[in-house]
UniProtKB/Swiss-Prot annotation:
Organism whose genome encodes this protein: Oryza sativa subsp. indica (Rice)
Record domain RRM: where: 23-102, 179-253
Family (UniProt): Belongs to the RRM U1 A/B'' family.
GO process annotations (BP): mRNA processing; RNA splicing
Subunit text: Component of the spliceosome where it is associated with snRNP U1.
A Pfam cross-reference name: RRM_1
Chief location category: nucleus
Protein name, per record: U1 small nuclear ribonucleoprotein A
Function: Involved in nuclear pre-mRNA splicing.
């Protein structure tokens, strides 16, 4: 990782003796098969329950695969996220989370301590090396502003999105316990993969089904009623976003 990119996102992995608590957490051991936008969207959904997120950073380059940085508004949120999500099975791989080494540029700019870094002199750089460098995308300029990630794919933050049919969604009237769960109050940006990431950590998980015509709801199937009940008890009220707590019940049959 180049010095500029490392500093911009918080310095990369902390030193072995640990970095001091700060607002940026560094995550590695992430599933490298997940597409970049899906990865950032999933991380934002999982970590937003701990506090306001200013930025989620991940890069396409080979040396940055399997890594990401989440910048919170305050240290308390970052600390709670680190403690709560350490080793969480994110896309079937346990997350390794640490504090980033240095203050990220996004925070330095906000508190007025930001000092631009001088670019390395390249007068003596070999022509072929310079040409190769110029052909590469300058990842140090990707997503470093406070408003770079107002929401997924440039949309408003999930907390600002209207919840379609919020007044119409009601819990099933009489429900017989069974192996299929009915999940409500999901933000519009929720994907089957995001829900699978949450529910697959419980035994007996089979699949997630969503209905495009009815955003905000999903069905999650388990092997038997007992397995479905265990998952429901653990995830009831889980915050997909700060304003979206999952409402889980048994599905009608």
């Amino acid at each position: 990782m180049s010095g500029e990119v490392a500093a911009a996102v918080g310095g990369g992995a902390p030193e072995e003796n640990g970095a001091p608590p700060n607002v940026t957490i560094y995550i590695n051991n992430l599933n490298e098969k997940i597409k970049l936008e899906e990865l950032k969207k999933s991380l934002r959904a999982v970590f937003s329950q701990f506090g306001k997120i200013l930025d989620v950073l991940a890069f396409k380059t080979l040396k940055h695969k399997g890594q990401a940085w989440v910048v919170f508004e305050d240290v308390a949120s970052a600390t709670e996220a680190l403690k709560s999500m350490q080793d969480f099975p994110f896309h079937n791989k346990p997350m390794r989370i640490q504090y980033a080494k240095t203050k990220s540029d996004i925070i330095a700019k906000a508190d007025g301590t930001f000092v631009p870094r001088e670019r390395r002199k390249r007068n003596d750089e070999k022509p072929e090396k310079k040409q190769k460098r110029e052909q590469h995308h300058d990842v140090s300029q990707v997503g470093l502003g406070v408003n770079a990630y107002p929401g997924v794919y440039g949309a408003p933050p999930l907390s600002q999105l209207p919840f379609a049919g919020a007044q119409k969604v009601m819990m099933p009237e009489i429900i017989v316990p069974n192996n299929i769960l009915f999940v409500q109050n999901l933000p519009h940006e929720t994907t089957p993969m995001m829900l699978q990431m949450l529910f697959c950590q419980y035994p007996g998980f089979k699949e997630v089904r969503m209905v495009e015509a009815k955003p905000g709801i999903a069905f999650v199937e388990y092997g038997d009623e007992g397995q479905a009940t265990a998952a429901m008890n653990h995830l009831q009220g889980f915050k997909i976003t700060k304003d979206n707590q999952m409402l889980i019940s048994y599905a009608k049959k």
